Design a protein with these regions (language model features):
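General beta-strand structural signal in soluble alpha/beta enzymes
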Residues: 26, 74-76, 193
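Short secondary-structure junctions
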Residues: 16, 67-71, 150-154
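C-terminal edge-of-domain segments
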Residues: 64-106
Length: 206
């Protein structure tokens, strides 16, 4: 369940605030629908989504903690277009019930994971590097984003889906991204989401 917990934790990281409602939708042809309770994936996903790290002993109580806190984490199955046995889409909802965003995820074994889609954009998150994602829906938003990115000397790549442009920006662990986070809520910016490093770092022998 460590991979599932990290998927949930990274999803919460991308959201940038507490998650009160989410659907975890399993690929119906994958292994999750028949194994997620027995293998503890329900505790993993729920714990991560409510902010419990994979290494935290509270993970085993995550489902009851979520219930006590009034959070609604629902498990479903659907056809997602089978790509991996441990494939799940997570839909995050605001308190008023409207969908905020979705991610497509794979738990790949050994506590490792991949997030391959953010809304309809193709991305690559595995928890080992820091990235920020800026989605612009107007030319004004694009101009604001590029000024902020140039200010911190960042490199970036872009992709366009349905009149929206996503900037994918790799960051160093110490790179200050306040000017990028300040884009939230600005005209033409539909979202700014950050992926932090969450995988355990191998300690060097002294």
């Amino acid at each position: 369940s460590a991979g599932c917990a990290r998927i949930g934790f990274m999803t919460r990281c991308l959201y940038g605030k507490d998650i009160t409602q989410a659907d975890v939708v399993f690929e119906e042809l994958g292994s999750y629908p028949s194994t997620y309770v027995g293998q503890g994936s329900n505790f993993g996903f729920t714990g991560g989504l409510i902010g419990i790290p994979a290494e935290d002993p509270r993970l085993k109580d995550a489902v009851s903690i979520a219930k006590e806190q009034g959070r609604k984490i629902v498990f479903k199955k659907a056809s997602l277009g089978f790509k991996h046995p441990n494939q799940a889409r997570i839909d995050v909802f605001a308190a008023d019930g409207h969908k905020e965003f979705s991610v497509m995820t794979y738990s790949i074994g050994g506590g490792m994971f991949q997030i391959t889609e953010l809304d309809e954009f193709q991305i690559a998150i595995d928890g080992s590097s820091r990235q920020v994602f800026i989605c612009c829906e107007t030319s004004e938003g694009i101009a604001l984003a590029e000024v902020a990115l140039e200010r911190i000397g960042a490199a970036w790549s872009t992709q366009r889906v349905k009149n929206r442009t996503l900037y994918t920006v790799p960051l160093t662990r110490t790179q200050n991204c306040d000017s990028i986070l300040a884009l939230r809520g600005q005209p033409g910016i539909s979202f700014v989401r950050i992926a932090e490093v969450i995988m355990p770092v191998a300690r060097k022998a002294v």
